[in-house]
């Protein structure tokens, strides 16, 4: 087995892929009207909506902040989509190479069964339409730190359902890509996903952090399932999707109550994941530094910490990077900040 096969999950199909790209736009911007390259739109703001198709593009709003002046729209672009549709509540659009989809399940006293059905439908759609390489998922979970009707934390309830879908589909947790599981202020659970018809997908781990699906049961009856990053593309290029990254070493939260310390460790973890040594270990030849990361979403639990997090990020990220700060809850109650991004 190659080094890539030992250290990172590599899957390849024969079609060359150059991954879609993201832009952050002002919600309601007239620039979005009539743009035939739009693959999907996610509005981040102070309310939520059901998923829909607008001009052939999947669209939804997630309640991920608490002030209207912090709202923005995450716009995904690719070639002009060749087809779009709705299946089992999933709004999707596809090009020859990519599939982008959005699905939501409403608020409930229990989420495991609904989450299992949601992910089962996502897996079935990617297979039936011919996009077997799931490259990135985002999960926005309302009341993520509250308890469900059985007294189980909602995030843990969600993880049980996602794991059930993998069990039922015979899917190896190591094949699950980069992901975000983050709080929302309402709206149930919204899942956004990107899949590819072909190319190469390599899941990347962090040598300083335990692989998520190996977490001990102290974090819940079923562990989360995601890679720390996923590289997608042809051998000569590609895009690196970086999961929401926190102040965790091993499997433990560090710097309890200290948002500066947690933010610094989160950025250290991100730098470690995308660095040349770690990527080579996984079979990706080109390394990166934090200055290469763009289109970052930074999730901050406490509003009073927003300015501190903004300063820490500004000191370590590129001055030209698009960075959006969102005031929302995080999967672990002792985590104060998580950071995600991507590298072209």
Curated annotation (Swiss-Prot):
The keyword Transferase does not apply. InterPro entries: Chori_FkbO_Hyg5, FkbO_Hyg5-like_N, RutC-like_sf. It catalyses: chorismate + H2O = (3R,4R)-3,4-dihydroxy-3,4-dihydrobenzoate + pyruvate. Changing residue 338 to A: Loss of chorismatase activity. Its EC number is 3.3.2.13. Competitively inhibited by 3-(2-carboxyethyl)benzoate. GO terms for molecular function: ether hydrolase activity. Changing residue 215 to F: Decrease of the affinity for chorismate. Substrate binds at residues 155, 162, 215, 228. Monomer. Involved in the biosynthesis of the macrocyclic amino acid-linked polyketides FK506 and FK520 which are potent immunosuppressants that prevent T-cell proliferation through initial binding to the immunophilin FKBP12. Catalyzes the hydrolysis of chorismate via a 1,4-conjugate elimination of water to yield (4R,5R)-4,5-dihydroxycyclohexa-1,5-dienecarboxylic acid (DCDC). This is Chorismatase. It comes from Streptomyces hygroscopicus. The gene is fkbO.
């Amino acid at each position: 087995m190659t080094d890539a096969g030992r250290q990172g999950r590599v899957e390849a199909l024969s079609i060359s892929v150059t991954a879609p790209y993201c832009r952050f736009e002002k919600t309601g911007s007239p620039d979005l009207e009539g743009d035939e390259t739009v693959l999907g739109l996610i509005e981040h703001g102070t309310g939520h909506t059901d998923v829909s198709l607008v001009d052939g593009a999947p669209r939804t709003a997630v309640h991920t902040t608490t002030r209207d002046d912090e709202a923005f729209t995450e716009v995904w672009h690719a070639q002009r989509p060749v087809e779009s549709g709705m299946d089992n509540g999933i709004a999707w659009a596809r090009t020859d190479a990519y599939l982008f989809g959005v699905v939501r399940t409403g608020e409930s006293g229990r989420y495991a069964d609904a989450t299992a059905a949601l992910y089962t439908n996502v897996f079935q759609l990617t297979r039936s339409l011919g996009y077997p390489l799931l490259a990135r998922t985002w999960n926005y979970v309302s009341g993520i730190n509250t308890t469900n009707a059985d007294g189980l934390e909602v995030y843990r309830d969600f993880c049980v359902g996602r794991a059930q879908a993998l069990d039922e589909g015979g899917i190896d947790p190591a094949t699950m890509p980069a992901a975000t599981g983050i709080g929302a202020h309402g709206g149930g659970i919204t899942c956004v996903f990107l899949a590819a018809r072909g190319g190469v997908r390599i899941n990347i781990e962090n040598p300083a952090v335990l692989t998520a699906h190996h977490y001990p049961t102290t974090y819940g009856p079923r562990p989360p399932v995601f890679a720390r990053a996923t590289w997608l593309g042809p051998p000569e290029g590609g895009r690196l999707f970086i999961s929401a990254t926190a102040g965790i070493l091993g499997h433990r939260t560090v710097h309890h109550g200290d948002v500066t310390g947690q933010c610094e460790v989160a950025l250290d973890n991100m730098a470690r994941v995308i660095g040349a040594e770690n990527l080579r270990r996984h079979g990706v030849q080109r390394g990166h530094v934090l200055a290469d990361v763009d289109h970052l979403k930074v999730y901050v639990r406490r509003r009073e910490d927003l300015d501190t997090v903004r300063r820490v990020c500004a000191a370590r990220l590129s001055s030209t990077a698009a960075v959006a700060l969102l005031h929302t809850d995080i999967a672990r109650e002792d985590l104060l900040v998580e950071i995600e991004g991507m590298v072209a």
